Amino acid sequence: MPKHGKKYVEAAKKVDSNKLYSVEDAIKLVKETSYANFDASVEVSYNLSVDPKQADQQIRGSIVLPNGTGKSVKVIVFAEGPQAEAAKAAGADEVGADDLVEKVQNGYLDFDVVIATPMMMAKVGRLGRVLGPKGLMPNPKTGTVTMDTAKAVQNVKAGQVEYRVDRQASIHTAIGKVSFTEEQLTENFRALQNAILRAKPASAKGQYIKSCAVAATFGPGIKLDPIALMA
């Protein structure tokens, strides 16, 4: 086990590791236990009763958080014609087709989200070795493969986050910054929570949400009551 520093130890003293907190109490505690010398992210971790090896239990999607993420996001769009113009008008940081594919192949990686029209995916697919390991490959399930490039760009800029179950049947995503109000963080959490519940596979067995915790970056985890989350 890694040895934690003094600040972490002091923060952890405020958390009862045997208690399952309500959403409101957990959010309040996250703000109180953040000790980073920057505006830390507030992160949520779920462990679900799903089998990621089963195709119908590979949960993945996106949600626009009502209060945004607190982060400035750079978006590039692979599109041509009207879809390219719409993406530019919506505020995309870079829009292109073959020229943008070549630019990325040559090492350009100064972006956080990639959007593409369906027609461009054959060309974007050539970037799989670059985009895939970074989780940047566009996907219809997350709204990043679409003809409505303007809406996709607007959603990302407004605070869209992706959620995806990993091999351990866990989901990790950020819901904002410590500087957000408790109400803003709670609203964002509820939006993510509702999306996770809606994504429950029909074939999932047992208690869907096995555990859930929130934490500030570097801060101690605060466990929530999974039964209450499913009520």
Swiss-Prot record:
The terms describing its cellular component in GO are:
large ribosomal subunit
Q: Which domain of life is it from?
A: Bacteria
Task: Please give the InterPro entries that the UniProt record associates with this protein.
Answer: Ribosom_uL1_bac-type (IPR005878), Ribosomal_uL1 (IPR002143), Ribosomal_uL1-like (IPR023674), Ribosomal_uL1/biogenesis (IPR028364), Ribosomal_uL1_3-a/b-sand (IPR016095), Ribosomal_uL1_CS (IPR023673)
Keyword Ribosomal protein annotated: yes
Q: Which PROSITE patterns match?
A: RIBOSOMAL_L1
Q: Which UniProt keywords apply?
A: Repressor, Ribonucleoprotein, Ribosomal protein, RNA-binding, rRNA-binding, Translation regulation, tRNA-binding
Query: Which proteins does it associate with, and in what oligomeric form?
Result: Part of the 50S ribosomal subunit.
Family of this protein: Belongs to the universal ribosomal protein uL1 family.
Protein's UniProt name: Large ribosomal subunit protein uL1
Q: Which gene encodes it?
A: rplA
